[in-house]
Amino acid sequence: SADVHTQKVVVKKFLIPLGLFLGLVIFLAVGLNRDPREIPSPLVGKPAPAFSLNTLDANAPKFGPQDMKGKVWMLNVWATWCVACREEHPVLVAFSKANQLPIVGLSYKEVQPQDEPAGKKFTPEEKLQFARDRSALWLKRHGNPYVLSAVDLDGRVGIDYGVYGVPETYVIDKEGVIRYKRVGVVTPELLQSTILPLVQKLSAS
């Protein structure tokens, strides 16, 4: 009858949007509950984005990933203002002493707006010098696990590397390809269970 047909149409009109809504809710719930550290980076398996940056050493030439060609190495994104980096740093210092794997630092957005004098903006040279001075002092106090640390003042290199926040760590192979990315703190357990076995495998190939 017409009434039954009308009821079916109404039910369909109601159920389809409801189904779509529930599907969206489930999708979002899964996404929100998923640890962002476990989400694979689209960069893994691809060449590390090229860059050329000043380092903390004013007398050293600029650095880029191409300078590490032929070596397996780690790139660690850090900053002195990063609270989680303080938790991670002793782990990296101990690791660098016990292993031959070169760790390159990427000093990320070291100079924050509140660091600049009131009513005055740093020139690019002043900004770089401020970053060098504060970072050098911090590394002297906490230990230096890095063979060198490049300075990403404006965070542009961080954008190319898909940096969510600090710290982040990448393992890069002899051909300059990113093989692993970690968002968040590197722990001793992670080094032993994941990073070291990967490094040994890449070094042997």
Q: Where in this protein do the model-derived segments appear?
A:
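Thiol/disulfide oxidoreductase modules built on the thioredoxin-like
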Residues: 14, 140-146, 151-202
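Structural microenvironment flanking redox-active thiols in thiol-disulfide oxidoreductases
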Residues: 86-142, 153-159
